[in-house]
Amino acid sequence: MSELSFDAPVWHHGKALRKGYTTGSCATAAAKVAALMVLRQHLIHQVSIVTPSGVTLCLNVESPHIEGQQAIAAIRKDGGDDVDATHGMLIFARVTLNDSGEITLTGGEGIGTVTRKGIGLPLGSAAINRTPRHTIESAVREAIGPARGADVEIFAPEGEVRAQKTYNSRLGILGGISIIGTTGIVTPMSEESWKRSLSLELEIKRASGLTRVILVPGNHGERFVREQMGVDTQAVVTMSNFVGYMIEEAVRLGFCQIVLVGHPGKLIKIAAGIFHTHSHIADARMETLVAHLALLGAPLELLTLVSDCDTTEAAMEHIEAYGFGHIYNHLARRICLRVMQMLRFTKTQPVCDAILFSFDNHILGSNRPVDEIAKELQC
């Protein structure tokens, strides 16, 4: 990626969106400039780094400070138009020179600690991912030369509070944010980074020994599992709109059972073979309902009413009024069939189940008895 391509906006639905840079780039730049300040013994207010994707970033330095053989500097995180929990916060680096010839990297205040296996970092270590570790160490080495050593501490005073708005606690990263970024650049509306974070939670569940997983679109699904199924939510992973991707990831990781749990407004799309459920990809909710109601012998009047609905909830009211609530069991079976069709070339296919529930947390339908599914999940 060239500097020009970094400055060029990302177009999404007709809007020009600005790129940003990761916490990893911030930490790298802060460490580099702190190392340079120790060596030169004067404050520096701007620093440049080359990101793993080849982009050169020229960043403003905040809170520079030198005290003997130690210096501190901060870079303010800018996510561009892809605003996340870390946007606008300061990422600090403290660099202390020594004669060891080695560079040691630690996480201080506001940087999370790894407490679970599955994310590729040792238990008890700072949540500074592999790529940022490499770029930080390389930038400091470039600054101090081959003979000197340095102790580098990355810290973020707002980190513990900001981390509460992230997935970190679910990933077993406690006490602060993560220093992340494989490219160093934040691309607005990037599905890949979002998908990767969801997949990472799957990897952690599998590394903990779980072989059965419940995929839900969001928090409502997790609450239903806890309150209505009586199943430990340790087995629950959010799939968001990325149904097909998360199913394939679960298969790749060797889960033997996948249970899809959600409201018909999301899961009904799977019955039509739609495995990315965001409305900008596809809708077909009413068309799918109408088709399956017709297969069950519903009268034309009901089909017309459902076809004219704008929301799944409105359609569900008509379905209930006409006594066709059994469609939800039918749809759940169809969802499982579609999943197995998608996985037809997989050597070892998992057991697939689907459970549909209403917004008031009532079970609408499932491919087989929910009690039976719940019992298996508790094994």
From Swiss-Prot:
Documented EC number(s): 2.1.1.195
Pathway(s) this gene product operates in, as recorded in its UniProt entry: Cofactor biosynthesis; adenosylcobalamin biosynthesis; cob(II)yrinate a,c-diamide from sirohydrochlorin (anaerobic route): step 6/10
Identify the Gene3D superfamilies for this entry: CbiD-like (3.30.2110.10)
The protein's matches in Pfam families, at most eight in alphabetical order, are given as: CbiD
The GO annotation for biological process reads:
anaerobic cobalamin biosynthetic process; methylation
Broadest EC class? transferase
Q: Does the keyword Iron-sulfur apply?
A: no
Coiled-coil ranges from the UniProt annotation: none
User: What name does this protein carry?
Assistant: Cobalt-precorrin-5B C(1)-methyltransferase
Q: What organism is recorded for this protein? A: Salmonella heidelberg (strain SL476)
